[in-house]
A protein has these predicted regions:
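Nucleotidyltransferase catalytic core that binds NTPs
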Residues: 1-120
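Alpha/beta enzyme core
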Residues: 121-174
Length: 174
């Protein structure tokens, strides 16, 4: 964000719960809560919903002069999206500026920290309700024991540029 302010007003495309749920687990904070946090960061002028994993629709609608992105998308699941972003920005006469990715600051490490703290049945129930509202299909797998639960929690599959995970697990004590 600090680097982006050098180029003009900073508009953040923030993924909606629905967009996130298509690729990974639902975040702990709702879209509105995350928006509140992001719009109060120094340098951010506006936060717009990003309804899809792809940046393309927002780029076509907003037509920015620049898009600033960490260079972590040169490899991995976002590399195809990077190509599309370059194409759209070139068509619109804009420029993509890649800056060094900040190691250690990401949602995955935050997720690990929150998991270490634990949760309550009430929090899990509220999360399930949000998840059902955010996704057309919720992926739940039955766990026989703690080891199965750990596998379910950490299993992920890459399909092209899309990462799929189980949204939750269920255990029966028949």
């Amino acid at each position: 964000i600090n680097e982006a302010t050098k180029y003009g007003d900073v508009i953040i495309g923030l993924l909606t719960d629905k967009a996130i749920a298509e690729h990974k687990r639902l975040p702990y904070l709702t879209y509105e809560q995350r928006k509140e946090v992001v719009q109060n960061i120094k340098g951010v002028c506006k936060v717009v919903p990003q309804e899809e994993w792809s940046y393309v629709e927002n780029l076509k609608r907003i037509k920015p002069d620049y898009i600033i992105h960490g260079d972590d998308w040169k490899t991995g699941p976002l590399r195809e999206e990077r190509v599309r972003v370059f194409e759209v920005m070139n068509e619109q006469g804009g420029k993509v500026i890649e800056i060094p990715y900040t190691l250690g600051i990401n949602s995955s490490s935050l997720d690990k920290d929150i998991k270490a703290i634990g949760t309550t049945p009430d929090v899990r129930l509220k999360s399930l309700r949000r998840l059902i509202n955010a996704k057309p299909v919720v992926r739940i797998l039955e766990a026989h024991d703690g080891l199965c639960g750990l596998i379910i929690e950490n299993q992920e599959i890459l399909k092209g540029d899309k990462r799929e995970v189980f949204d939750g697990m269920w255990s029966s004590s028949l």
